[in-house]
Amino acid sequence: SVCHLNMRLSPTQINEFEKNGCLVIPNFLRLDVVESLNYEIEHLYSKFDINKHPMTKFMTEINGKHIGNKYFLESSDKIHYFFEPDAFDSKGMLTKPVDKSINKIGHGLHILDKNFKSITINSTISEICTQLGYRDPRALQSMVIIKQPGIGNEVPPHTDSEFLYTNPVTCLGFWFALENCTAKNGCLQIISGSHKMHTLKKRFVRDTEKGGTKFVHVNEPLKNWNSNVDHEKGENSWQKSSKYT
């Protein structure tokens, strides 16, 4: 098993998840598994061919327009690479090595990479989903997010159900820290209990008229699932990276 033990959530943990919309489980993955995942990330860097890449940057509303080109939209069952916007100079040239410039690798790691598949699809994850009320859970997407030293851009507050929409809302996210992630280097942060207070106000959809993507406004109540929790990832102005998958 990739986990320390084939665990079940305790009643206290389930109550904490339902109350806060998030549950932290320390030391969930074995240390050797974390090391192998970080090694695999380096291997993925080595396979990257910059000459065949459209130089797609991972953009959010903070950058003016959310990413939405063909390379991004066709990444659900592939391993695609997305750059930090600040890794380029004013002429569009990379100013750092590739392994210090990538923001995200995704979104089909659980399909094409055995290392990431092993932490996504296994009996422990399935058991946790069952305890939280899921009857037929499916892995939708997987990614590695890298907060690069000095240029790791901020991701604004949002809910995952804006991007991974179902009705009723049922998306559940699992985040695994692969390095020491802190407020200084852009860790994941949530607004505790926000899944009980907010309505879904917008959805991320394809723009069939102009191409790319856009947000459309909606007004729907949010259900009690992890994807409804407001969360953000701060910028990394520190000289130490953070990674999570």
Language model features: what each stretch is:
Residues C22-V24, G173-A177, K243:
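Conserved hydrophobic/aromatic beta-strand scaffold that supports enzyme active sites
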Residues N15, C181-T245:
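Double-stranded beta-helix
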